[in-house]
């Protein structure tokens, strides 16, 4: 799917919906009655969620009859509880987290997939690069011990002996790599590599998704009850998400600028946000989404996820993914 370029001025303005209403002589009170719902984000506000900010700023949810609150996540704000409780209509999660919750009885379904490619990478420096999984043998990798199953899955998928890799427990920072304490880092494509680039440090990344690590990320989850009883709200919410993320793709710099305009107290740096926003695009959009639309998946991509999740100790079936809301959004 393609989108027409959007000017920064339009992003930072009052929104197309409000402008259209004004042109028609309508007052805000004459617009469609609004249903208040919440979208629980998986982390703190940043350009990671800028497509949602665009949908809100442009009034696309308002057009659809929703008053959407964007709830920030964070280390002390897990996604799953508010979705289970019904205080959030939808949450932003990931297939592995959802699989874990379902194994404990949570009635979740995945409605859409924002990140088609998992953002986990192995970051390294050009003088001692990791270009493919086999290059990890004999190297020291800095990572959280909790992510050992992730590394083990990558090794299993690529025939690499994990015992040949030295795992060094580190905080989530580029400093151990820059100080020579490790040879590489397990991190996200959109954060520590960007931080190094902003410091003027050349670095490179090996995207684990390119080597079989298939775990859908930034997924939209809702409960089975919500799917059964609040479908119109789900369709309206996801319709806004689709429009917002297509607009984001058209101008990631404008999306980053909007992020800072909406959340000026979040301590965000504009240039960093611009780089992060741009690096996110290849993770979210592909030939698959160009053919079918933002958030889509296929039986093949689900099968690949099930295989990787099994290596992570999570047994799931294809019915964890429910495409019926997206099918309504796209009229499929």
Feature roles, as predicted:
Residues 10-31:
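N-terminal export signals
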Residues 230-312:
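Secondary-structure end/capping motifs
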Residues 46, 77, 145, 149, ...:
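Soluble non-cytosolic domains of exported or imported proteins
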Residues 96, 172-176, 180-265:
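Pocket-lining segment of extracytoplasmic ligand-binding domains
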Residues 7-8, 132:
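Residues that mark the N-terminal boundary/hinge immediately upstream of a DNA-recognition element
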Residues 1-6:
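Secretory targeting signals
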Residues 31-179, 183-187, 206:
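Short, glycine-/small- and polar/acidic-enriched structural segments
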Residues 299-332:
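Conserved C-terminal helix/tail region of periplasmic/extracytoplasmic solute-binding proteins
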């Amino acid at each position: 799917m393609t989108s027409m370029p959007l000017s920064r001025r339009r992003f930072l303005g009052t929104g197309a919906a409000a402008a259209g209403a004004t042109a028609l002589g309508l007052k805000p009170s004459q617009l469609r009655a609004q249903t208040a719902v919440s979208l629980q984000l998986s982390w703190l506000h940043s350009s990671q969620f800028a497509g949602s900010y665009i949908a809100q700023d442009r009034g696309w949810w308002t057009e659809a009859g929703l008053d959407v609150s964007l709830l920030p996540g964070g280390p002390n704000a897990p996604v799953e509880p508010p979705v289970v409780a019904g205080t959030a209509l939808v949450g932003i999660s990931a297939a592995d987290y959802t699989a874990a919750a379902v194994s404990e009885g949570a009635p979740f379904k995945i409605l859409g997939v924002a990140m088609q490619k998992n953002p986990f990478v192995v970051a390294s420096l050009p003088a001692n690069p990791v270009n493919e999984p086999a290059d990890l043998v004999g190297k020291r990798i800095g990572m959280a011990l909790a992510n050992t199953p992730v590394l083990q899955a990558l090794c299993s998928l690529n025939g690499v002996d994990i015992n040949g890799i030295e795992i060094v427990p580190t905080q989530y920072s580029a400093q151990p790599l820059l100080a020579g304490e490790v040879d590489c880092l397990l991190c996200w494509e959109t954060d520590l590599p960007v931080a190094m680039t902003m410091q003027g440090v050349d670095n490179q990344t090996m995207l684990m998704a390119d080597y079989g690590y298939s775990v859908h990320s930034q997924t939209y989850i809702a409960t089975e009850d919500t799917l059964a009883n609040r479908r119109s709200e789900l369709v309206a919410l996801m319709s806004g998400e689709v429009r917002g993320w297509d607009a984001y793709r058209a101008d990631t710099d404008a999306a980053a600028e909007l992020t800072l305009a909406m959340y000026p107290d979040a301590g965000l740096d504009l240039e960093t946000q611009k780089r992060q926003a741009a690096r996110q695009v290849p993770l979210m959009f592909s030939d698959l989404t160009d053919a079918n639309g933002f958030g889509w998946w296929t039986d093949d991509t689900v099968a690949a996820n099930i295989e990787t999740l099994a290596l992570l100790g999570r047994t799931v079936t294809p019915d964890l993914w429910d495409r019926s809301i997206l099918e309504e959004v796209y009229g499929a």
